[in-house]
From Swiss-Prot:
Free-text function comment from the UniProt entry: Potassium channel regulatory subunit that modulate the delayed rectifier voltage-gated potassium channel activity of KCNB1 and KCNB2 by altering their kinetics, expression levels, and shifting the half-inactivation potential to more polarized values. While it does not form functional channels on its own, it can form functional heterotetrameric channels with KCNB1 and KCNB2. Each regulatory subunit has unique regulatory properties that can lead to extensive inhibition, significant changes in kinetics, and/or substantial shifts in the voltage dependencies of the inactivation process.
Topological region Extracellular: 240-270, 323-337, 396-408, 429-435
Residue ranges, compositional bias (Basic and acidic residues): 499-511
Biological process per Gene Ontology, one example term: action potential
Topology class, membrane: Multi-pass membrane protein
Keyword field contains NAD: no
Family stated for the protein in its record: Belongs to the potassium channel family. S (TC 1.A.1.2) subfamily. Kv9.1/KCNS1 sub-subfamily.
Intramembrane annotation, residue ranges: 409-420, 421-428
Protein name, entry field: Delayed-rectifier potassium channel regulatory subunit KCNS1
Pfam family, one: Ion_trans
Amino acid sequence: MLMLLVRGTHYENLRSKVVLPTPLGGRSTETFVSEFPGPDTGIRWRRSDEALRVNVGGVRRQLSARALARFPGTRLGRLQAAASEEQARRLCDDYDEAAREFYFDRHPGFFLSLLHFYRTGHLHVLDELCVFAFGQEADYWGLGENALAACCRARYLERRLTQPHAWDEDSDTPSSVDPCPDEISDVQRELARYGAARCGRLRRRLWLTMENPGYSLPSKLFSCVSISVVLASIAAMCIHSLPEYQAREAAAAVAAVAAGRSPEGVRDDPVLRRLEYFCIAWFSFEVSSRLLLAPSTRNFFCHPLNLIDIVSVLPFYLTLLAGVALGDQGGKEFGHLGKVVQVFRLMRIFRVLKLARHSTGLRSLGATLKHSYREVGILLLYLAVGVSVFSGVAYTAEKEEDVGFNTIPACWWWGTVSMTTVGYGDVVPVTVAGKLAASGCILGGILVVALPITIIFNKFSHFYRRQKALEAAVRNSNHREFEDLLSSVDGVSEASLETSRETSQEGRSADLESQAPSEPPHPQMY
């Protein structure tokens, strides 16, 4: 039998390790003994009434045996009643024999709540910990849900049930506004594609200039020009609908069709037409530039904002293609072409959505609608049920009167207007039963619409604050540091992360060993 001295993991204590020889080819048996020269001294390792000294994450306290005896099922209660040092070591992370102190590598804030539990018998919820971390700490120390105080039990259970959707409803917490790690990793993965591309650094800089208004001064100027062009295009479309710009539309259109020419060029004002061409040229430049600079073509066509950019210029080119296809046809075909062109012109209204690329509120609204399809579906279902019920009642009460309630489908319009509390007044009931049905329809609409609107508003507030936090982080960051961060995307490897993780753990162990005093101070007694 060989007797060796080994060091502890946290404190500089010595223990004896007995190595028992085994037959050739077998493994040696290592046995740790509590103190040198061995456990067979006939002396109990701790007195039953001795106070328990613990160190939880650097917080040292001393607990009386009487307080721990009240809760023998907890970890500290079982540690106090441990019959041997080996049994006690299984319940803690380390043990200092010189100071007779037990070490636990756990959350020190929860430990303070644990001390309050041993004094009062009630555990209170910590707001600094999420419900899952709080539950893990409580399970580790041997506490159940029954240990929670009555003032915190309902709140804890509610937060535990709603925590998976906390970003929907509990959006006031700072963590709910923080950027999602998955989104950050997706951005880094996209930017890493430029590393192997031709002129990757230049393309990445141009891409960020066009996509991120807060990236640099040129990106801010580009954003201002883009917004100005969008507003000019919308203004031109609105001005074209004024009566003074349509005075000669009918006569000019008839003359153009009779001459076998397209009526579109004649009807448009020359100034507005040139402004439209300029806007189309700018929009085409934006779409083509983003397509050429995009890190992934497939992801480019899947992005909603890029699809909006394509739709904003698509009507113009479809009109040109239709004109070329029917260029050699007669005036009748031009008449049909005019109707198609009017439909394409109507699609120009979608250009206002291009402002979403430069507006935090519009992007937040889009994200809200994307994540609120269940609530929107419930709202539409409630409205459909209410409209169907009250329309049938109104039809039954008003069908004898000639006031517009001739059929149930005709009453659907009245029911929709009434339930949404718009109240155009074009169709109104005149009988007492019809007015009672209208009153119920209005009150039901107020109650039904208000239920899901609150959830949708909370989601919008969350996404708006989150988007503002992202923009503030980019705006307040140094340009050079931001560029260095982007340049180091494809230089981070799993091995380097593992090395840094091991280095931080070694540094933490060294700090803990250096902070462990040879003669620990007298901790507070509980």
